[in-house]
Amino acid sequence: MRRALSLLICVLTVSNLFAQSGAWQQRVNYAMDVDMNVQTNRFTGKQRLEYWNNSPDTLRRVFFHLYFNAFRPGSMMDVRSRRQGTIQVGRGLDWDQRVKDRIVNLKPDEVGEQTVQELKMNGRLQQLINHETILEVVLDKPIAPRSKVLFELNFEGQVPLQVRRSGRDNPTSKVRYSMSQWYPKICEYDEDGWHPTPYVGREFYGVWGNYDVKIKIDRNYIIGGTGYLQNAQQVGYGYEKMGQVVNRPTGDKLIWHFYAPQVHDFMWAADPEYVHRSLHIRDSIPATKTSPAIPELTLHLLYKPTNDKAENWEKILTNAARALPFIEKHFGVYPYKQYTFIHGGDGGMEYPMSTLLIGPGAWLHEWMHSWYQGIFATNESLYAWMDEGFTTYAEDRISAFLDADTNFAFLGSYRGYVNLAKSGREEPLTTHADHFNTNAAYSAAAYSKGAVFMEQLGYITGAAVRDQILLDYYDKWKFKHPTANDLIRLAEKRSGMKLDWYKEYWVNSTKTIDYAIDSLWENGKETMIRVKRIGLMPMPVDVQLTFADGTKELHYVPLDLQYGVKPIEDTAIPRKVYAPWNWTHATYTITTTKKLATVTLVDIDPSQRLADIDRKNNQLKLDWSTPTPVTVQ
């Protein structure tokens, strides 16, 4: 037990040092008891919330999320979804197909409900103001900087018919309860102030802390979710220690007791027909002088063989075990003792230590969210591309490893981005996730353009340096809510380059990359190749020349704004490094001592990592068997 806790102690120590360095973040301890009525689909709960105001600010009010209230006719989520259904995007409408106009048609016993009946701070009742999915609490006494208070809440709710993420009784998966966003959750407060974001079905941002949750439900239900089950021997259902007797209490209901350290949310799901499988991956590994302790790890799977075959579900555990060494080598150690893949009413959708899956296909994407949503916990509303995009990047890379596929792993993401850039619908990645004009633009930006950011960073810095940046990012920013500036500054330190220009162009604008071969000619003993920048986003450029004898040369032109040169990536091909290309200049000329007549191919960006929106002008094949040489003007 001491070994298993050593990583958490290390994490908390790092968090304290983080606070002492001048930065700060709020902290919470939740203790919740909830009682579910499976006949009425209603629940009641009590919450004790210890809240640390580690900020230098005096807080005169606080805010809580009440997500279930979005699933009511006329809600902001309902109105927005129906509005998007009037917008033509390509050949269809801009619906979220899972939501569409379903909320407006919910009956009274199908809607969602979340009500805080009373709330006390340090034993005193507080004034409550409801704003649909946000509860504003006007405090009778301000919370002083660097102080702690205790909130006590009584709440009740109704589980909505499954629409999006949370809910019950999906007719396809036939899962009874997918309980995400189910409790009053305090909003995050950071250096930008409060984040009381009304829920319209998009992203999340939570406070780091510990969750102690007891769920009372009919004794034939099986539960999985966030955290470590504390009373496995009283519950059973495959959680008990092998060979030991299960001692279930008498009565119609069981209490499931979970504890989740150092997380920012808590999800659970329940169904009487779940099949539970588990796979123990490793025992705990003690800390050494050069590395922290690594906790033991067990993977769990809860599924119903309804909308997919059992064998497809059960492959998840073996595939995850096979992927884990590669994942931890490139993206950092998984820091918790368990992870649960859960067949849910919607998904995939990620939560700390767990995921909801509508089918087995999305398991890898959702698991990698444990890093970019679970461990880093960036503000997803402001930096969705740092969560969805980096998760997609990791998924693509790991999938290639699992499939032993040597082709370019990120082609789908690059195509998704290029289609967005050419659609006329693109908005900057800095757009708040809730406020993109179209769902289509949001999805392509967050997933595709975000993934391209990371692979293209490797084009700029060199892939090996980018890989070290990923590990540096994990080591420095896990459990700390990093921003885009935090990532860029860290990447600059590792690469020795200036990279703020990359963020300004790629994240803050919609300017595009387009380079072309302009012309070729001989000048004495040299062959000259002029490259032209057509797009408005400048980049360093790799130009590869192939000659009639099969030999190749790589000509590397750094960008002036980067103030550095990437390392050689392929020692088998000679590389020539040029003086930087000034971003103000539209053309640049490279040279080779080989005769023009020996050049058979000029190729801008042979690695395909440059997100060039028109690759047709990136290559020039020369056929010297024709009477007149081919030249581009």
Locate the predicted segments by residue:
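N-terminal, polar/Ser/Thr-rich
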Residues: 13, 19-44, 171, 499-501
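Hydrophobic alpha-helical and helix-loop surface patches within well-folded domains
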Residues: 19, 27-28, 66, 258, ...
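Short, hydrophobic/aromatic-enriched beta-strand segments in well-ordered soluble domains
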Residues: 47-49, 66, 147-161, 211-219, ...
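A surface-exposed beta-strand-loop module
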Residues: 52, 92-172, 580-598, 607, ...
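Solvent-exposed beta-hairpin/edge-strand motifs
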Residues: 61-124, 179-180, 216, 220-221, ...
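Glycine/proline-rich low-complexity spacer/linker segments in large multi-domain proteins
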Residues: 76-89, 156-211, 608-633
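Hydrophobic helix-coil surface modules that form long, contiguous segments used
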Residues: 185-193, 201-364, 393-396
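Non-catalytic accessory/interaction domains
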Residues: 229-232, 464, 477-633
